[in-house]
Amino acid sequence: MFTSTGSSGLYKAPLSKSLLLVPSALSLLLALLLPHCQKLFVYDLHAVKNDFQIWRLICGRIICLDLKDTFCSSLLIYNFRIFERRYGSRKFASFLLGSWVLSALFDFLLVEAMQYFFGITAASNLPSGFLAPVFALFVPFYCSIPRVQVAQILGPLSITNKTLIYILGLQLFTSGSYIWIVAISGLMSGLCYNSKMFQVHQVLCIPSWMAKFFSWTLEPIFSSSEPTSEARIGMGATLDIQRQQRMELLDRQLMFSQFAQGRRQRQQQGGMINWNRLFPPLRQRQNVNYQGGRQSEPAAPPPLEVSEEQVARLMEMGFSRGDALEALRASNNDLNVATNFLLQH
């Protein structure tokens, strides 16, 4: 919506689609038709601590009771779907699960710290909903999404492809009195999980058997078909932003066309030109001898070793093993570059 995240829609993002549809529908249902049931979904840490209502840690942290929070979090989840396409549904779900669990612990710590140091009681006033993992996604968004300037205002200030996302996050951050506690706990959990602190990414993860089960049962329900009638250009808010996005698209297409042209020429001309200086080897080739008395060219270096773990990650995203191997070799084992290359083709 706001950033260049590949194809529009929810193609290759079934988990993001389910997080958009199910909690939003339940939030509307509770607000319009079942307001008397909202008390069951109140996020009340005081009741959890004193009355042992442990179930509130689950029910109170899934569905938003404020429609403004529902709207803002849905927009953010839609824009953060790029991480599901990049990492795969299993790793994306593991990140959300890990940050969701860790943020509950940080909520307790922050509430107790406020009570101890400042005498502020916030245990019964925390906002409900799937908010902490949404704030946690700002950590990989800040660290891994490149910043592209699209306009410059007031001297050093500039508008980038990430500005509107940060503004939307700020709107969600200021939508309630104590939502900043949930936001800080979400950011802290995102930092812990993204930096692999204390190996939490190995403990709080989705098992492979569970991922396969949901891929067989729920993924067909929430999967979306590949868009066919689009130019793969993000729709900017102004003509200048759209023009900048088209220029970025042309640059990417030029790079990929040069890459493909180099591959074709290398296959046709063999070893007459050492294309390995320009492009990493994609396939192992046999040495080719040319004119009888002419000394053959130096042997091409062996193909780059590819990590099977990275191949497995790309295959979990839906790519074939051959395409995954070729993209990883072409990108010198850079998983992010290989993923972006495959998503563009």
From Swiss-Prot:
Q: Which residues form the UBA domain?
A: 305-345
**Entry keyword set:** Endoplasmic reticulum, Glycoprotein, Membrane, Signal, Transmembrane, Transmembrane helix, Wnt signaling pathway
Question: Is Membrane one of the keywords UniProt gives this record?
Answer: yes
**Bilayer-crossing regions:** 92-112, 126-146, 164-184
One annotated GO biological process: Wnt signaling pathway
Q: InterPro entries recorded for this chain?
A: Rhomboid-like_sf, UBA, UBA-like_sf, UBA_UBAC2
Q: Which residues are glycosylated?
A: 161
Signal peptide: which range, if any? 1-35
| The keyword Signal is annotated on this UniProt entry | yes
Q: What is this protein called?
A: Ubiquitin-associated domain-containing protein 2
Q: Which organism is it from?
A: Macaca fascicularis
